[in-house]
Each structure stands twice: as C-alpha cells, then as structure tokens.
Amino acid sequence: MEQKNIRNFSIIAHIDHGKSTLSDRLLEHSLGFEKRLLQAQMLDTMEIERERGITIKLNAVELKINVDNNNYLFHLIDTPGHVDFTYEVSRSLAACEGVLLLVDATQGIQAQTISNAYLALENNLEIIPVINKIDMDNADIETTKDSLHNLLGVEKNSICLVSAKANLGIDQLIQTIIAKIPPPKGEINRPLKALLFDSYYDPYKGVVCFIRVFDGCLKVNDKVRFIKSNSVYQIVELGVKTPFFEKRDQLQAGDVGWFSAGIKKLRDVGVGDTIVSFDDQFTKPLAGYKKILPMIYCGLYPVDNSDYQNLKLAMEKIIISDAALEYEYETSQALGFGVRCGFLGLLHMDVIKERLEREYNLKLISAPPSVVYKVLLTNGKEISIDNPSLLPERSKIKAISEPFVKVFIDLPDQYLGSVIDLCQNFRGQYESLNEIDINRKRICYLMPLGEIIYSFFDKLKSISKGYASLNYEFYNYQHSQLEKVEIMLNKQKIDALSFISHKDFAFKRAKKFCTKLKELIPKHLFEIPIQATIGSKVIARETIKAVRKDVIAKLYGGDVSRKKKLLEKQKEGKKRLKAVGSVQLPQELFSHLLKDED
C-alpha cells in the first residue's frame, strides 16, 4: 500500500461516549471482515473490559477501506476514556497523525473530553470533532456544536454527526478521515526506526511487541536492537491485527503492527522504547511518550503465603502490558510477604487486582491505598513515604507535606452549590469557575490527593445524580498538619491498617474505622479490643464480644459445682486465648474499608 493511502488515527473521548461502538462500525466497513464474527466491544478483548463496559487497554487494528474505487489502509487505535488510563491515550497518540474527538450529544463535553483534546493538541495532531448518539431523543446537537466550537475553534458545519449504534453518518466520517488526517511521512529506504507503544506476555511466544514503524522496513529474521535496554533480538514472526492476529512478511514505514522475537527477559522490553537495526549506532531515539508517575500506592498480599512466588512471577508479566504500574517487594508484620504497587487511581488498582486474581489464579488481600508524603526530619533530611506504617515518630518530624491535585469538575448548573460544598468538606481550595455552555459549568479546586482517593468520586456522582464528570492532575506539595493513626487488634499493632489523616478529621475517621472493623471482623472465642491510637494516646475504641460456647449443654441435672467447674475452665481458656490468640482477618475486609465512610 502506498503511504499516501495510509491513515493512522485514534478515537479519544470521555468514558461511555461510544468509542468502542464506533470502532465496531468502522470494523464493519473493512473489506474482507466477516460481519458474522462481529460482537459488541470487538476491540475490548479482556473479560474484565466486557463485564465493566469500559475500555482499559488500547487496541490497534488494521482496516482495509474502499472509497470511490480507491483502497485505503486505516490503522485505528481504540483508547480508554477513564482518567486513570490517560497514559494509554498518550501512548496511542505517539503512534498517530490524527484523532477523532468523540462527544456524546446527550451529555456534551465532559472533563476527559477536554483533557484528551489538550493531549492531541500537544502532539500536533489533526483533530476531527465527532458528535455521537445524534438519534437519541435527548440529544442536544446545537449546544454540543457550540461547546466544540468554543473548545477547538472549529467551524460548526465541519463537525461530523454520527450515531455509532444506528450506523448513521459513518460513510461521511470515513471520507472526512481520508480528507483531513495526513498520511505518514516516513521513508522506506531510510534505516529502521520504530516506536514500541504496547506489549504483552504470551506463554508460548514470549513478549509480543506492538510497534509503529516510522522509517525503514522490518522483516522476519531481521536482527533489531532496543535502544534503551541495548538488547538485540531476531524477529521470529510479525504481522498486523485485523482484529485477529495475521502474519505478514514485512512491516514498512507507516505501518502499525506486532512482532515476536522469543523475548523472555521481561526487563529488556520498555514501552516507549525505540527499535532500530542491531548494527545501527547513529539513529536517535524517538520522543516516545511522557512517563506518568503513580498517584496512589497500595500493598497486595497473597492470602496463602505459599503463593508469594506466584505473585512475583505474575507481577513481572503483568507490568509488560501496563507501563504505568510500579511495584516493589515488601513485608507486613500482619499480612506477611507481598508487593507494594503504584497505581494511577482506584479504578487502576481494582483492575490490576482483579486481573491478578483471574489471570493468575491468586487470592489477594489489598491494604488501604495511600499517597506519597514528603517528610522533613528534625535533622534536616527529607524522605518520601508511601506507606503510613513507615512514618517516623512525631518527635523526629519537623514538617509533613502532602500532594495536592488540580481537580476539574464539569457539571450542570443545578448541582453547582452542592458540589462546591462537597469540595470544601474535602479541604478543597477554590481556583476558578468557567462556563462550558448555557447549562454547564466547569469548576476548578486544589485538593489533597489523600482526601479524594477514597470516597470523593462516589459522593460526587451521588450528589450530581451521575451528571458530573471529574479530571485531575498533579499540582504541588503543601505543608499540612497530618497525624498517623495506628490500629491495634487485641493490643497488637496491625501495620497494614495504619493511615494518615489531617488532625482535624483524625478522631472522626478513627471512630468510623473502628466501627467498621467491628462490623467486618467475625467474632472469635475471645474478646477483641479494637483501638485507634495517635502515638501512645488512644483516640477511639470498639470491642468485639467473644462468641459464647455453651459448655454446660451436655450436662443434665447433677451437682451445681460441676457446672461451675466447667464455666471456670472456660473462663481460664478464654484468658489464655486472649493472650496468645491471633485475630483472623477476612479477605474482603480491606475492600470494604475503602467504601464510603458515611
């Protein structure tokens, strides 16, 4: 295929605006694709994506399109819409020349729409605005056009109108893609230069790499070098996705495809790396994409300690397909060996935990998530803490700083007052208020990340009846009056349950934490005191009463002294159990603790 007939583009949008459905419609227009094979969310290949109805992983496919008897090759990359997976979008854009910016006509522009539009502008990509769901009764097409005009400065009559579900406007959209998105500029005769934008682990092939070839040509048996790791491998097989894996003899400049090279050393493959010929020492690496740092950290521990080695192997494999995931090994006094992982948000954390349990057959306990605090010690040294249990004693701390994020909330006018109150309750600092269109506003607050990772998003959705959308980005670190609250069960500190809270909210949260633990931990044969402490001071307490075994049930009649003897024996046994007995924590304990504190 000549380069002038190739188009590389992504579909970007806010979550649930119809990206995957539009991808399905474009697939139907591909020559040679059998419609009987089509199913909803065709490009969402993970079971968890289909169950949740969201896209988690980017997916690249090749489409053969015929327009006016001219053949074209589309390389479409379907991207996620949730704020936690912005890094997947940034990787997709590095492999494209243009994007379709999709907006739901019933919901209008939302937080992630604006964020994704800015990402495309930063990458100097051609943006085609598309309004979806135009056949819905509550579609507000004119207002959505006005919003897109204000955001991008585009002419209203140039905006594509489609209904992906009803297959309306798709032919016109395809013609617009051909007319507006430029073809790739690479040259086949130049030395090989390709961007590795995604990868995953196959138990038979090793690491399978997804690449965009910018210059040159890649063939089976070619030797290639990863610039960052300086590793050399020989290509075993290569091809494209249609969306099924198809083998090819070569990939050339402008193509988006995959290759396998028997790569078993997982650390040799880094997403964002540049691939060149093995003897090429002069080609400079591509810009790749911006590395995104984790926002929250959480410990994952196997329920059965014998699964620890399996967890280590699973983490090594899963990180290949998730460039934003970070982890290190750690030990908890209460939960044993595990890994401490860095995630981009709570949804990212839930997805990784669920993938580990499903794909690698592990049963895991997750500790409450935490953010990274910067601690200035009295000796002048500054340290970073992502685990509350590692916070030094108060006497050794001069100051603690916590991360603040800039939060953008798009919402209808009628919920503005309630959402402002919510932000204030979460220690928000007002920044700005702007009008999106006649009925919608965008407010901006500076908020502590540690406050919003728990229940802020759920409360926002509840207050706004689901109409508010949220996006956030790291802003800075600010000094705060924070305290470490430690939880003791049966007078033993449980390090995995420690948390850091602002001193104004410490008592209230500790009290609710203890109450929840009392509800979640099953009764034992001995009484269990639950205490929340700051330093040596107990600030909250609950008690789980002992379950009573009826030791005198087997007696009938007889001397009362026999009954007393059995009751005294039970009393002594419970005293011993209380001294040496261990408290069994249920697997679902920590996930329930993360839910709304009200």
UniProtKB/Swiss-Prot annotation:
Q: Which residues form the tr-type G domain?
A: 4-185
Q: What is its EC number?
A: 3.6.5.n1
Q: Which reaction does it catalyse?
A: GTP + H2O = GDP + phosphate + H(+)
Q: Show the coiled coil region(s).
A: none
Q: Which SUPFAM superfamilies match?
A: EF-G C-terminal domain-like (SSF54980), P-loop containing nucleoside triphosphate hydrolases (SSF52540), Translation proteins (SSF50447)
**Keyword Protein biosynthesis attached:** yes
Listed GO MF terms: GTP binding; GTPase activity; ribosome binding; translation elongation factor activity
What PROSITE patterns has UniProt attached to this entry? G_TR_1, G_TR_2
Q: Main site of residence? A: membrane
Record flagged with keyword Protein biosynthesis: yes
Q: Which domain of life is it from?
A: Bacteria
The UniProt keywords, alphabetically, are: Cell membrane, GTP-binding, Hydrolase, Membrane, Nucleotide-binding, Protein biosynthesis
Q: Which CDD domains match?
A: EF4_II (cd03699), EF4_III (cd16260), LepA (cd01890), lepA_C (cd03709)
Q: Which family does it belong to?
A: Belongs to the TRAFAC class translation factor GTPase superfamily. Classic translation factor GTPase family. LepA subfamily.
Protein name according to UniProt: Elongation factor 4
Q: Organism source for this protein?
A: Mycoplasma genitalium (strain ATCC 33530 / DSM 19775 / NCTC 10195 / G37) (Mycoplasmoides genitalium)
